[in-house]
Amino acid sequence: MECQEFIVLYTHQKMKKSKVWQDGVLKITHLGNKAILYDDKGACLESLFLKCLEVKPGDDLESERYLITVEEAKAVGSRAVEPDGSREALESGSRTLVSSSRSLGCQPSGLKRKATGFQRPYKMPKKVTITENSEPAASLGDENPGPPGPRLLPTFSSTLPLFPTVGQKDLTPVSTDNQSPITFSNRERSDTPLSLPSSYFKINTNTLGKEDKLCFPVSSETKHSDSLLASEPMRRNGLDSHCPGVSQNVRSKAQILALLKSSSTNRKDLHGEIPGHFPKIEPQGCLNIISKPEEDYAETQSIGNLRCEQQSENPTRTTSRWARYLPSQRSPPCSAADENDTEDKPEAQEDVNIFNLSELLQKKSELFETCSKKGELHSEDKPVDNTCQYWNQEDNLAPSFCKNSSVLVSCSSKENASLLSESDIQYSSKVPVNQHEKVWTREGSQGADADAALEPEYRPVSPLPEIGHKQTEVEASLSTSSRISDDIADMGSKSNADREDLKTVHKAVQPFLEVSFNLSNFETSDTDEASQEDSRLSQDSERWEKEAVLTDDSCVQKSCEDIGCREIVGKLPLLSSTDDEPKEALPADGTLLSEFCDRTCVGFNSGPHGDVKTGKALEGQCHSDTGSSLDSSLEWSEDVAGDSREDASQSIQGNAINCGGVSPSKKPRGVNRSLYSPYLLTAVTDPAPENSDLLSEARKSPAIEVSRALLECPCEHRASQQPVEFQGHQVKGSATSGVMVRGHSLQRGCTQFPDSIDYENFLTDTCVWTPGLPSTYGQTDFLQVISPEQKIPALSPAPTFSFNTRNEDTVLELSEESLKTRTLPGLKTIGFQDSKNLQRFPFLSGASAPFATLPADDGPAVLDPCSFMIDDDAREPSGSSMLNLCEESGLSFDLGLEGQGGTPGGVSLLPKSSTQSKWLKYQNPPQCNSTAPNRLASEVTEGLFAEAVSGLHFSHTSESESSVDPVRLQMIKGLLHQQQQDLVSRKQAFSLTLNQTCKTQEHETVLGSSASKNCRAKDLQEINNSDLCFPNGQKIISAYLPQRQVHIPAVFQSPAHYRQVFTASIIEHLNILLFELAQRLYKALSKVDISFYTSSKGETMRSGKNNSPSCHHNQPAKLVMVKKEGPNKGRLFYTCDKSKDNQCKFFKWLEEVTPGQLPQNTSQSTMVFNDIKSIGSYLRSQKVPVYEECQLLLRRGFDFQRKQCGKLKKLTTVNPDFYSETKSKIYLKLSRRESSSVYSKGDLWVISKTLDFELDTFIACSAFFGPSSVNEVELLPLKGYFPSNWPTNITVHALLVCNASTELTTLQNIQDYFNPAALPLMPYLLAMSQSATVSSKNISKRKFIPPAITSIKTKTELHLGATLQLARELINVHRLNKDQATALIQIAQMMASQGSDEDALEPFGHSLPITVIHGVFGAGKSYLLAVVILFLVELFEKCDSGTVGNARPWKVLVSSSTNVAVDRVLLGLLSLGFEKFIRVGSVRKIAKPVLPYSLHAGSDNESEQLKELNALLKEELTPIERVYVRKSIEQHKLGTNRVLLKQVRVVGVTCAACAFPCLNDLKFPVVVLDECSQMTEPASLLPIARFQCEKLILVGDPKQLPPTIQGSDAAHENGLEQTLFDRLCLMGHKPVLLRTQYRCHPAISAIANDLFYEGSLVNGISERERSPVLEWLPTLCFYNVTGAEQVERENSFVNVAEATFTLKLIQSLMASGVESCMIGVITLYKSQMYKICNLLSAVDVGHPDVKAVQVSTVDAFQGAEKEITILSCVRTRQVGFIDSEKRMNVALTRGRRHLLIVGSLSCLRKNRLWGRVIQHCEGREDGLQHASQCEPQLDHLLKDYLEKQAEEKQKKKEKEKSKDKSH
């Protein structure tokens, strides 16, 4: 059937007699059952379903909004109704749907802007890199014939500088991360083959905007190193500068040596600079920490991602070539590798002995320089000279990462050692079959062609053999490590090709890193799963390896930085390859960290890297701790390298350690300890003492010790880091090296020394972090060891330190001694355990410190707020927090990596989150252990750490946007964390298996609590550090909306704890709202091209002219949004930009812009905008409330007081804040204005200088209710506002987030009033003082209450006997039932127990000052409260008569969350004859009978109140209501209520109105909260804290609806939804149960009694008293309606059949004489409510009061009751949320006499709860009926009614006629 079109007339004025009709077009779809109405402009107005399939001219149709008259059929192809332009518009409009849908379909949803994820589009000095590496690039292409290289190269060449990730995406099918690495590698290749590793890193960095720079160093090792040194600082300053610097900075040997010397001398500075470069190489490693943490880190992350992608790509294409290198490097058989090892061994030893990073670097730089000079840099395979050979060897050796690691270690000394041991550990980890396989794969991926070959080779090979081989290689490389370092320098200079080979080899070696990943093998597979399967896994592993390598490089860089930039640069790539084993181990860690370790291994890498960054200090630490396990670990690690191949298979851990360590004798122990975290944990657990010995040994030998210490520390870190790696990686994300190292180090320490004191110390430094990671890895032994250790050591100090020491500077500033102590200065300041103990865990401390350093930006604040918590649960909490941190960090890092890689943030987030979830699974088990002692405190601490770390990660990940990124990271982390938690819960069995030590219950508890703890800590961190956070960047586009994770405990440890937790929970909620808006914003921006705006040069402006079509005047059309209600509301269309008089009829939907009109460089489906207004209109159409091009105005406050009262100038000095306001006020002049209802006081605004809200953004709230007459809104900054950054009259863009007045008010209330001095009730809100008061601790607290505070307490002179006597009198007078009497007696006892603060200390002398009353529905709660208030008033009058001194008068405050609830109690007082109260609130919201006793709360202006009251008089009121309003006007004119407010003893006010100024000076010792189960605890605290409450009465029903928190969902039941009522019950309060219900017919109450109250209900009403309203109407009935549910907007449902039957039921009831006010309709969905309301308003029932029928949702009906209740269930397919017990309880208990349920019998009967409801109905007579059977009876009733109505009308007419005739 063809689509038919009809010319119609339509009107929206359905009910008016004289209607205004408009022209339109009605299109009938091809199915014939649906029609779409368009106006004459072609705008789609509404769609309607047709009852008759045939539409003819003359038909009258009715839709939901319009009446439609069909005039004539429209001829096909004819113009529209109007002759000219408008017809065109109509026609185009008619085509709009099809074309727009077509275009939308083509539109790639994930399309990203060019500057995706970048703060600004950085122009990469790619050309320079290409120029330098032109030869190498060519050679690379040749050497790496694999298609990926060449293909990627061109792709990258075109988009490399800005979008390496994007290019990678296209090039590689690997996961986002993988793709990113691939892209990077391609770039490197294109830029320079050898520079691939560095370039690789660089590219990642470049992804941030430093990619070119990285490439440069990579391309020419020598040049790069020089440029690195010189340009590293530049890089810190700017990525761009670095890139050019690289190309230009070719230093001579002497220069490089000088630089190296200076670097070694100023290691910190070098690290700062070089790390920037290295971070590119090792995004996870030191780079971030040392240099700009954010930029470098971001770069490194990007690099890591690119690398990973590259690796995956390279393995396939470069396998053969790389295999050549890899076999030599990786396999001990390789002669090259062996030679290198042999040669490197002495060098390595030399380096180790020297442990002079400068010398090492010098050597390496010399080699590198030589190679560069000789132009051998470009030769991959053949070394030109010895130096070149070394380089080549290094390349070959690169597979044996140990070598490179050793070199690195020697270079970085401590740092390198850490790297080595870490890499070794990882390597050994890789040795395990699972890991090894993946490791090899990874290597293959990294190694490009060779890697690809290796990947297949390794895959076939059994993991153990591979591991052994790797270990062997590692040993060799370790032995040659020092030489390798030099070689690396040489190689770097040798040739880019060599470097590329090295890179590939490095990548291959990185699989060693993958070993670490393998440690997390299970996780690895999970992580890999996220990206791909085995090959994918291998690629991922490779990526991870690469990332690990990057990390390694950054670590190396740290140390190397001191030695020399050039060498480091060359070394980094080479290190990646040459130090392949150690590095690989590290890279594996890094790789794992980035991919798998993103969740796991990464953390591990980070730890060592962090240590490396603090190379000198760490080195010093290592030396001082020569005797400690670190050195020994290093020593035996090296030895193990030689001997541990067999051991490798036996103990992968040992192998890894061997690679990293020097002493053979201790290698077995060391291996276990340093190597494989999971295995190592096991091994370490058993040989814990040995481990400690090893550590001590390591400390004993200084030369090797330094490197060993570094290695061992990393090893230790690894051991714990392996599990920690996941965290570390995440941490890595935040603070590439430093942070990660710390966290991991601590964990490693635990791993290595589970049973040893060193282990303990490590744990202490590690805090709980270490244990958590091992658990994550699933090392049962380690976990076991760790869990006890974690519990034992004071982990909190480490976490505290980490928070304090988040700063890079802190890490750099670490002194050798501090490193020795294994604590950063910050840590020391915080005060870790004994410095000696710390020394035992220098790396752990270091790791923990760097970790802290990363979070330092956000973490320190968090730390401080949560410090008390950390102290309480120091060890356990720390562990938990570390785990959580890792978890969260990992998530963040993953996100960051993806973003950096250039892949869409969302895409990367999703896979990573899944992987992370797995890691979370592991993390949770460790948390169990650590959580055991103090879960609460630990949870808080965990959360804090996690949040801090994750925040840093996020910032790094998000490309140096630390301030916003941390928030977004935290938000994403929250999401990922939730996902992880989900995974954890799903895979609990697996995690439990991993954590054998943890009991199942403990594990589960930890999982839940740790998650919540993490979230809480995160939130605390956000609150303390950044408060509100608006995420920037597009990484969040595809992320899931976070859920609230903050866990609110039943008991609090202190007021500070209470404030922190609730502040965190509220901030978390607001941040989720901000996240959701940011997600909408970036999703909308990702679908369009705004390159004209984001481009610095505006090159696309030329094409912008073509973006918008031309109107009939040949002028660019303007973009306008549809504002009228209807289906097209919010759609954008082009129209003429002329004035109305000259406007042509041009019209075109935005989606209809033809592809030819779009710029060539954009996809056809992308809409292009060339002006900001169009972007703003588009964003608003996407439900983003943006105000573009507003003005930010700053004005000084005027001193009105001084001007008006010149003689009182002295007063200005008395209170200058009040009399002379010097602060500037901020005003936002809006560019447009909505209706006044859109704005309110407390609106949340986000202000930015850029329309993409990426840079220079702050959050503020509105100070008043709306814009002024000149569209100005006064703003109060909340977060991110710095006056120097925001000059006046600047153009800004604004987002109106939501109204947050409640949240902001509660936050302010908690901060201002919740303190012991102002809240006497506080101790009882924190914990059960009844039992706690017995402790001396509690008593001592009370002693600190100042006398001035206790003296103002109210005092009663009444004895308990007199109070109880008064209560009994009232019980008799008001006939209270037994339960009500019990409640009143308990209140009387509470009031008699005076001196609540002192006397309550007597445990059994008096009752608690809190009474909790649980009243079921209809239990007379409001009546009971009225009687209680009468009792209190009489009591007050008696006791106040004898008060003396400054005792406060007794007053009672009646409060609730709703006006109805407050008025209900006051109406009860009126019914009892009590009128001495004042109701404070809004005039329009107060019940009319209470109005005469009201006081307007909003303003002190009497005239405004009178205006409101006079306006009420003009409305439709009943006579009695008019009396109330007139009386109220009189009271207001006289001002009596304002005076009475300070005199009366009873005041009623809602919680929200408690902050109004008229209540400022009042104190209410007694507070009554009604409907408390519907109020959040922060809202409940408004009346409690503000008015210095001493006695509290809570009334509610927790079995009814909980508070609704709009905008965010909770991940558990202990968040903001947990009310004060719930928490007090959990705390131990026993509520008084009011069991007697007086509302419902016994048949109705029987349902609730059976389903929800376990048979405890008592009926206070008989069936006779609830007789039917109509004889034919059943008391309880289920009407089965056969209808179909339909999904409406906002995922709400409609059932038209049920709505129609409900309407007929209402009509029948009213026709039978039932008053409309007796009928209530409850629907479970809003859309159904609107549908029924529309039907009621549209149908003329002939009853004037039809509108009085109350139709509302369950939420709005709570507290109300009706004689007849009709319940519409709506759903027909699935029950959905309507089976919520609390929701059902409310819905079923609103009717007093009749409950009529309308629903689908077949659907609801399947549900457990609804099935039982139906059973109850079936048990009644006529309890189950079918609508089809009932309708005839109802129709008959209606017919009779209508006939009677007609007769009456006829009679009236006849009477009138007869009267007329008589006249």
From Swiss-Prot:
UniProt zinc finger (GRF-type) residues: 1111-1153
Transmembrane segments: none
Positions of Zn(2+) binding: C1111, H1113, C1136, C1144
Subcellular location: Nucleus
Ranges where the record places region Disordered: 78-110, 132-196, 300-349, 460-496, 524-545, 610-664
Biological process terms in GO annotation: recombinational repair
Signal peptide: none
InterPro entries: DNA2/NAM7-like_C, DNA2/NAM7_AAA_11, DNA_Repair_Helicase_ZGRF1, P-loop_NTPase, SF1_C_Upf1, ZGRF1-like_N, Znf_GRF
Enzyme class: isomerase
Regions of compositional bias (Low complexity) in chain numbering: 92-105
Subunit structure: Interacts with DNA repair protein RAD51; the interaction promotes RAD51 strand exchange activity. Also interacts with DNA repair proteins EXO1 and BRCA1; the interactions are increased following DNA damage induction.
Its biological purpose: 5'-3' DNA helicase which is recruited to sites of DNA damage and promotes repair of replication-blocking DNA lesions through stimulation of homologous recombination (HR). Promotes HR by directly stimulating RAD51-mediated strand exchange activity. Not required to load RAD51 at sites of DNA damage but promotes recombinational repair after RAD51 recruitment. Also promotes HR by positively regulating EXO1-mediated DNA end resection of DNA double-strand breaks. Required for recruitment of replication protein RPA2 to DNA damage sites.
Name of protein: 5'-3' DNA helicase ZGRF1
Source species: Mus musculus
Gene: Zgrf1
